[in-house]
Curated annotation (Swiss-Prot):
Organism of derivation: Catharanthus roseus (Madagascar periwinkle)
Record key words, sorted: Chloroplast, Isomerase, Magnesium, Plant defense, Plastid, Transit peptide
Lineage start: Eukaryota, Viridiplantae, Streptophyta, Embryophyta, Tracheophyta
Record-listed E.C. numbers: 5.4.4.2
Protein name: Isochorismate synthase, chloroplastic
GO CC terms in record: chloroplast
Miscellaneous section: Two isoforms can be purified from cell cultures, but they are probably encoded by a single gene and may arise by post-transcriptional modifications.
Regulation: Not inhibited by Tyr, Phe or Trp.
Major localisation: plastid
Task of the protein: Involved in the synthesis of o-succinylbenzoic acid, 2,3-dihydroxybenzoic acid and salicylic acid (SA).
Top EC class, one word: isomerase
Length: 580
């Protein structure tokens, strides 16, 4: 058990009356979820409300310490049912013992001798009522790339190929494969842009001594004053420390229950315990294997925004800007949103299960607030990872399909590796990331040679970086500096971002934003590409994008969008001709 003096938190009791309705219409600026929402203003901050008793950690003093941060590990058991019994007893004991601290966070965890997949556990829970929920799986079951100057010189692989090993300070943390969580011990959400104070508000609840207390979530691609209705529940950012968490480890598992409170924000210790017990009563201890041969869903229609004609016009507009000697633009990343209507509701976790079977060289994630759609993804790209003061990042750009044979695959990789247009696009991304790391880190190692990163269906140009931060506060600088990278926005960033805001006909929301977790000693964030927003009433929004540079061809780039969206489209049977 570890107990430290941390920072103070802000809480809020959420009482929402929202109802969500998916796909109200499909015009360019359509809001795909219409719902009534209750909003109140507290301490000059706009606060979201939800039906569960929880606290919004963004509403207190980010620099005031939380009274206690603890992890208590109970004896191991053989099954999830026994683990929940042990947790329930431990939580009841907590209720009978009032802490001296006015605020705090306590994690109770029970190891399980059996190996159970976190996604199976999450799918076995009540998917309609046990919200919010989250899921995060590291790339190739590895979250942090550990390499040195010698490694960079001698290796030409990627983390996905198993050359890099994970480093950590906790045996359980070291063995962690994936995490699933339900309920909210503390959440962090606001319509305002993610700030240093928001980062501090999250970090106050975290400790190096409690590495598995983590805040999982995501940040929008771009903060804007008017968030589209389908993204409203996520705010400008959304992070949650789950009340009940299932950790999948190598060869074993673990169930944890977390309680967080702050008297100053009107959520007392006793209230937090009752809220946790209410959530635990809904948790199922029976875990069924999630079938990976999804889906019985058939595709009725598909509508792209922009459509092919508008795409060609916008891409040619980018090329004109790039060719203008008075314009600073050298690259703009354009995106497409595909609205699909299906014969039945899509199971977001079944889609994730299919991605896990399809290939392990990517991060898989799911984030779903209360009364909101599920944001899921299968992204190959890391924004950054942090272990203590060491930070990792990577450049990933340019795309080719995989070949049907080894010889064709090698030929396509060679074409990618030698293409002037693709190398120019990749060079923009790599140099920009290197410069941003140089500006923040005391030292930076750059992989001297680019390589080809091979995924299940596509391949990219790829290079890695490692740097040393001056202080832990530099984590926020890394996040705010690296995002958005030229791989999802363009270059120069502000010029590309302005072009996107003025020309893109939909709200990207969390698409292409940072998705991952903050921890006390470690953090890991992917880039939320290859993602979709899945709601109720039979439908989804599928997002894909690509970089436009000098030499880009509208027809070829459209084909690349189709290739990137294919991981989702292949999961649906064709019921009727898709709309173009």
């Amino acid at each position: 058990m570890a107990s430290i003096t941390g920072h103070c938190v802000a809480h809020f009791t959420d009482l929402s009356t929202r109802k969500s309705s998916f796909f109200s219409n499909s015009n360019n600026n359509s809001s795909l979820f219409r719902r009534k929402s209750t909003n109140i203003v507290t301490r000059k901050k706009y606060i979201f409300c939800s039906t569960s008793l929880s606290m919004n950690g963004c509403n207190g003093d980010p620099r005031a310490p939380v009274g206690t941060i603890e992890t208590r590990t109970l004896p191991a058991v053989s099954t999830p049912a026994l683990a929940m019994e042990r947790l329930s007893s431990a939580v009841a004991n907590l209720k009978s013992t009032l802490p001296s601290a006015q605020s705090g966070i306590i994690r109770l965890e029970v190891p399980i001798e059996e190996h159970i997949e976190a996604l199976d556990w999450l799918h076995s829970q009540d998917q309609k009522n046990l919200l919010p929920r989250c899921y995060f799986s590291g790339r190739s079951q590895v979250t942090f790339s550990d390499f040195t100057s010698n490694d960079l010189t001698n290796r030409n692989g990627s983390a996905a190929n198993g050359h890099l090993q994970r480093i950590s300070t906790s045996s359980d943390d070291k063995n962690l494969v994936s995490v699933a969580g339900v309920g909210s011990a503390v959440l962090f959400r606001s319509p305002n842009p993610f700030s240093f104070d928001d980062w501090l508000s999250i970090k106050r609840f975290l400790s190096k001594n409690c590495p598995l207390i983590r805040a999982y979530g995501a940040i929008r691609f771009d903060a804007r004053p008017h968030i589209a209705p389908e993204w409203k529940a996520f705010g400008s950012f959304y992070f949650v420390v789950p009340q009940v968490e299932f950790d999948e480890l190598h060869g074993s598992s673990m169930i944890a229950a977390t309680v967080a409170w702050d008297n100053a924000l009107s959520l007392t210790y006793q209230q937090a315990i009752v809220a946790l017990q209410t959530t635990m009563e809904q948790v199922s201890s029976t875990v069924s294997k999630l079938r990976q041969d999804v889906s019985h869903t058939s595709l009725v229609s598909k509508a792209n925004i922009p459509d092919r004609t508008s795409w060609d016009l916008t891409l040619n507009r980018v090329l004109e800007e790039i060719g203008n000697k008075y314009s600073p633009l050298t690259k703009v990343v354009l995106a497409r949103r595909s609205q699909v209507i299906t014969t039945s509701d899509i199971d977001p976790l079944a889609w994730l299960s299919s991605f896990k079977a399809d290939g392990k060289d990517a991060y898989q994630f799911c984030l779903q607030p209360h009364e909101a759609p599920a944001f899921i993804g299968n992204t190959p790209e890391q924004l950054f990872g942090r272990d203590q003061l060491t930070v990792f990042s990577e450049a990933l750009a340019a795309t080719r399909a995989r070949g049907e044979s080894d010889s064709l695959d090698l030929q396509m990789a060679h074409d990618l590796f030698s293409s002037p247009k693709d190398n120019h696009e990749f060079a923009i991304v790599r140099e920009n990331i290197r410069q941003k790391l140089d500006a923040i880190c005391t030292s930076v190692e750059t992989e001297p040679m680019k390589s080809v990163r091979k995924l299940k269906r596509i391949q990219h140009l790829y290079a890695r970086f490692a740097g040393r931060l001056r202080s832990e506060d530099d984590e926020f600088k890394i996040l705010s500096s690296l995002h958005p990278t030229p791989a999802v926005c363009g270059f120069p960033m502000e010029d590309a971002r302005k072009f996107i805001a003025e020309n893109e006909m939909f709200d990207r929301g969390l698409y292409a934003g940072p998705v991952g977790f903050f921890g006390g000693a470690q953090s890991d964030f992917s880039v939320g590409i290859r993602s979709a927003l899945i709601g109720k009433d039979a439908g989804a929004l599928i997002y894909a994008g690509l970089g436009v540079v000098e030499g880009s061809d509208p027809a070829l780039e459209w084909q690349e969008l189709e290739l990137k969206a294919s991981q989702f489209m292949k999961l649906m049977k064709l019921e009727a001709p898709a709309l173009k």
